[in-house]
Amino acid sequence: MTLHRQIRRTALTLYKHNKQRGRQLSEESRRFFRKRKMTMKKRVKYLHICLTAVLGLTLLAGCGQTEKVPEVRETVTPLTSYVTEEEWEAADMGQEENNAAVAAVMKKAANKDDITIACIGGSITQGTISNGTADKEVGFKKSYVELFSRWWTDTFPETKINVINAGIGATDSYLGVHRVDEDVLSYNPDLVLVEFSVNDAGSNRARINYDNLVRKILLADNHPAVMLLFMGQTNGSNAQTSHALVGFQYGLPMISYCNVIQKMMDDGQYTAKELSGDTTHPSALGHAITGELLWKYLNSVYENCNSYPEPAVFDKPAFTNEKYLHATILPAEDVKVNEPFTVTCSSLGLEYRRTIDGNGGQFGVYVDGEYVGSINTDFSGGWGNYAAAEEIFSADETKEHVVEIKEMEGYEGKSCEILGILISELD
């Protein structure tokens, strides 16, 4: 059928539809037709001319492009098929209206503009894969970050996708909120995925840390999209409940791996040993399941991304407080035991190395001459050396303080390596 025949048929259909459904023409329109003594045939012809003119103007407005952008886009098929629809429903904790910011990143990538995606978290994000008993059957032995990145490169093969992996083992959102500026936001990411649900505690202090981390990302100058990923141990331990409260407050997409593996184990689909070789870190199977969940979410947004409006500028109030919005890490090369140093802050923390060689010990921390806490650099019998971070001092105002780290009695001569001074200042 030619275009003009389609237009003519449309005109006739519209006229008959109005007449049959009792949707009468307005009095003004009837007078217009009567004055010109238009028969039904002439009226259809008139509508045909009008529709042709409208179409012409539409084509001119579209710079001559007659091909309409499809409402539903084709999506890439997930690399695996471990997750059922029922399990996916358990994983997707966000609301439909929360996807506009992620859709905007997809639209940018579809236009072949370079995009940057970043993931910040602990060892799971860093790429640790434990040995599960079913891993021999897993075809894609990749970390979830690699699988997450693969969706973007497969979906937009002609777009440059920059990937920032800011995962550091044995760290939580307290260190995360202090390092996010340098490790993530300095790259001006379009999308940031946050994963700290295994390493964070469920305490109110931990919730404040996580809230400030997420809020700091959302308030960045380039307004990146944010996704929250809730990993979990096979024994069910994680901070999902606390973290989800932050996600609901800010209306963010939330994907729960924890919900899915608990359902899988309850249904007898997989055992704990298949999902993790050490209870904490996902096996290759666990990472594959996580990657599939992320692909399902991204596909669900992408196939209808044209329907999402432009994301609103983030302006929601803080869920807890804004204690760490100005958090950062100061270098500590010159910090020595028993030698005071000066720092201006409202809160103070220390990042220090814990070692398994037996040379670590207990050290007291003093602020303005008063004892405020201690750090323990000894990790004898542990799984390995690592960088610990903890808050030592907090106040309601920003001011200059004199800080000193002292050997405690019985630990003289023990090693104490300070890696960073974690500070924040209140407005």
Provide a role label for each language-model segment.
Residues R21-T39:
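Short, Lys/Arg-enriched N-terminal segments with co-localized hydrophobic residues
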Residues L59-G62:
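C-terminal motif of bacterial Sec signal peptides marking the signal peptidase cleavage site
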Residues W88, D92-G94, Q233-T320:
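Catalytic His-Asp segment of secreted/periplasmic serine-dependent ester chemistry enzymes
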